[in-house]
């Protein structure tokens, strides 16, 4: 055992896992990158955490609603009851991020930190924000003091 907390990352799609044909194009496909691919692109995570990944959905969040959020909530509850998981991070699209966060905050009563995150620009963009958001969300999920605060949300400030 490394002594580092284990964080379980659930991918649901969205811009954070989107990819375009070039770094300068505005066109991209949501949800085409796996959660494991996102983690592989973020330097430094292994210094403070062990990461497990899974992909629950792979779509734009405009296609996610209460039915999918119930499935997500059940999975979060399962994971936070596991002795092998110290926190959960969910990547989600921004179109319905607020609704998903609110829904999960109301229905989940996690005993461990749960943090949602997203991105405004796809992973392949020149100014992609998903890596920094994912880093900070995973870091937050390692903080034991966040237990009992429900489902939290992390996104970085937009550049001006």
Language-model features: where?
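Proline/glycine-rich low-complexity loops and linkers
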Residues: 111, 117-129
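Conserved small/polar residues in nucleotide/adenosyl-binding loops
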Residues: 154-159
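Short Gly/Thr/Asp-enriched flexible loops that form oxyanion-binding sites at enzyme active sites
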Residues: 90-111
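Short, ordered loop/turn segments at secondary-structure junctions
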Residues: 12-14, 93-94, 119-122
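N-terminal glycine-rich anion-binding loop in soluble enzyme alpha/beta folds
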Residues: 2-78
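Short acidic/histidine-rich motifs immediately flanking catalytic phosphotransfer sites
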Residues: 83-86
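Short, glycine-/small-residue-rich phosphate/pyrophosphate-handling segment
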Residues: 125-153
